[in-house]
Amino acid sequence: LGIKALGDCTRHFQSVECGVAARLQGPFGTFLAGQTGGPSLWIAGGIGVTPFLAVLRTQPLPQPVRLIYLHRSSRDAAYLDELQALAEAQPYLSLAAVANADGMPDLPAVLPAAADLVGVDCYLCGPPGLLMAAVALLQTRGVAPHRLHCERFDFR
């Protein structure tokens, strides 16, 4: 499971020992359910990669997807080895794993240019600060609001 400790409830999951039986429900979101079938840009910040990973594990991609996975270091990059293997196996998946130990990545350098975003649906999942900065930049690069889909992870 990929559960980040963000508050009282999720912090308890970090101390559960291996082998302990637990009953969990969810996830309940519909974040990626409304994909249009055209090209997509997926932007994941840290453990925000999990909804994208769930899709990649269960079905082949029917359209081109560029996944930009932002993380602090390769040691902290959850599921990076699996994502790299999936990118090699899936012809429609392009993976860019970008480490930035200093916090916020250089989004203007990492995100695609405006010409590469025409007709692309953008799906973002990560910390609120990253989402706000990425959405603002994508909008300045011409991405219409109806093509921006965000999933924050702030369950506490």
Model-derived regions, located:
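Short, conserved phosphate/pyrophosphate- and ester-handling motifs at nucleotide-, phospho-/glycolipid
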Residues: 19, 48, 127
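General small-molecule cofactor/ligand-binding pocket signal
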Residues: 23, 94-98, 149-151
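Histidine-anchored nucleotide/phosphate-binding helix
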Residues: 49-60
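Ferredoxin-reductase
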Residues: 1-23, 32, 39, 70-74, ...
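Conserved beta-strand elements of the Class I
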Residues: 39-43, 123
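C-terminal helical cap/extension that packs against the catalytic core
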Residues: 8-10, 65, 72-125, 130-133, ...
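Short, flexible loop segments at boundaries between secondary-structure elements
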Residues: 72, 139-156
